[in-house]
Amino acid sequence: MKIEEIYNNWKSLFPLSEAHVELLRNKFTTEYNYNSNHIEGNTLTYGQTELLLLFGKVSGEGDLKDFVDMKASQVGVEMVKEAVRDIGMPLTQNFIRQLHKVLLREDYTVYRDLPGGGQTSYTVHAGQYKTRPNSVLTRYGDRFEYASPEETASMMSDLVDWYNAAEQVGKLTPVELAALFHYRYIRIHPFEDGNGRIARLMVNYIMARHGWPMIVIRNRKKAEYLEALHRSDQKIGKVPSGGAYAAIGKITSFLAFMRQTVCEEMQCEIDIVRNADKDTWWYDGQRINFRSENGARLLKLLQAKPFVTFSEMSDSLSVNRSAIQKQIEGFRKKGYLDRRDDGSWHILAMNSKIENYNY
């Protein structure tokens, strides 16, 4: 099915019921922030992310910075949602810098060990373009340079001007606009840190501004995501200006990845809403296929009775205790559930049957 057909099917879901609006909003809040930050190395679990962002609580171990970064990420999401409501306001560099300031919150110093011994340091400035060259060592072993500090401001000015003009012309689709903006932005890499997170927020700014769904680039597809960018880099070359002014026809690999991602995200929402009368279970954007009906029955029981004992589970499901313990351990490893500090079971998988939605 073509992307336009899936988009039309997605649009046909509206207007959504209040229950579905809440369900999909909470789903996106957890899944977007969890995945976008995990791509950059955040260590919070899916359950910790949900508990923090939906319930305002902290549980389990974790680096304080990871908790703070996750909360800041959601503030960035809300900032994007607020900005797209004013369709008459063009994109500005100031908006991007303010978004970066929200994500990083404050300046901080990075210390790095030198190969021959000793240490060097530099300051990352929240909301300010980079003041030192930045580059990345690719997984293929070569060093990839981004725009220099001296050319960054002018390239960002050109990027924003291009976007506003391209939006008015309307030749590119919203997905093409979002993909090309992401690619050009990453080739500039205007900030010392946080560029990937900003790029993904800007994709959703562009998508939502044009009436398309905000999307999640999944951490499980990180290798595919980076490979799509890399293949486009190979086609364009290493010179930063080549990437900063790339044409849509030069980023076919990355555009294909983005189109596929958008299709999958829209289809996921379609399937969830259209299965509102069925007991289908989802986790991190994927439908769960159970080996037997006992899996779904177990999750439903734990959701309804979070303090249920193993003996009660066994009696209720007519399954022996050891089999239940084994299944629960499997579900925990997959992230479908966890156990809270008070001993209660918390289901992280989502049931699309709206009457079972219990946030």
Predicted regions: what they are:
Residues 1-193, 197-359:
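FIC/Doc superfamily catalytic core
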